[in-house]
């Protein structure tokens, strides 16, 4: 007996898992993990499945993290939020705004659960989670021991954290602590936000602008399955960026604190005239080249073949090799996404 994963991944790819367990508290989560381990089965914890591509049937247990709850503690200079890992991220952003606690508005409409946000160090429109993260509460899967990691201990990087490295498969995130400063500073560095006046802008206006940009440019997973940005924006050494800018002076580029330069993957893909290109049922989205969609009952093989095609075309034209932001899940767990599409 297997269970379809189609409802549990926003790509809408039809693979199955041996077991699917919905965990509403820590004990259920630990029990499901320990049961699978006793049976010698692989086990993975999933939020809303908005950043994964299942490559094949999963041979083990998928645990859906549904630990809920939001607690707010106000101090003189900040609001401190303690949020269950199974809460929906966008609903949290709305909750904070509705209660006059700004600071999350640039991250509106990012799909997925709160517990996934530190794994990827989610970011959009100039703000990353690390800017507001205070701590992450996890439970050690083998021992059931509680751990609280400070933001520094999470080792946040660009779409990266300790949870994608040493702590992968070792801990389950059960809650995230956020600190929203009362000295709100709007971040207006990207897209339509640059048109807003920092002196008069409200957090609600930033939220509305972000929602407008996302809904007009990004496909709704309920209509066309997708996992948001498929590729990371490449971060390259300064000399490589200089070389590229000599050939393409209008290429969007964002110098980083360490001297490297972040390029816009969507722009690179667009320059290769790849919008609308299809392989099987998978397609490059016509409005936002960074998004690959399930246009017509795509298989995971279609998506992988399309990602490979996009990577090759961009690499040949720019000598910049894109890496997936989406996590690839094989029969026994996560596999190397770059190798899968190389």
Curated annotation (Swiss-Prot):
Domain FAD-binding PCMH-type residue range list: 13-183
Reactions it catalyzes: UDP-N-acetyl-alpha-D-muramate + NADP(+) = UDP-N-acetyl-3-O-(1-carboxyvinyl)-alpha-D-glucosamine + NADPH + H(+)
Lineage: superkingdom: Bacteria
GO MF annotation: an example: FAD binding
Compartment annotation: Cytoplasm
GO biological process entries: cell division; cell wall organization; peptidoglycan biosynthetic process; regulation of cell shape
Entry-linked SUPFAM superfamilies: FAD-binding/transporter-associated domain-like, Uridine diphospho-N-Acetylenolpyruvylglucosamine reductase, MurB, C-terminal domain
Keywords: Cell cycle, Cell division, Cell shape, Cell wall biogenesis/degradation, Cytoplasm, FAD, Flavoprotein, NADP, Oxidoreductase, Peptidoglycan synthesis
InterPro entries xrefs: FAD-bd_PCMH, FAD-bd_PCMH-like_sf, FAD-bd_PCMH_sub1, FAD-bd_PCMH_sub2, MurB, MurB_C, MurB_C_sf, Oxid_FAD_bind_N
PROSITE patterns reported for this sequence: FAD_PCMH
EC number: 1.3.1.98
Pathway(s) of this molecule: Cell wall biogenesis; peptidoglycan biosynthesis
PANTHER family according to UniProt: UDP-N-ACETYLENOLPYRUVOYLGLUCOSAMINE REDUCTASE
Family: Belongs to the MurB family.
Stated name of the protein: UDP-N-acetylenolpyruvoylglucosamine reductase
Species of origin: Salmonella typhi
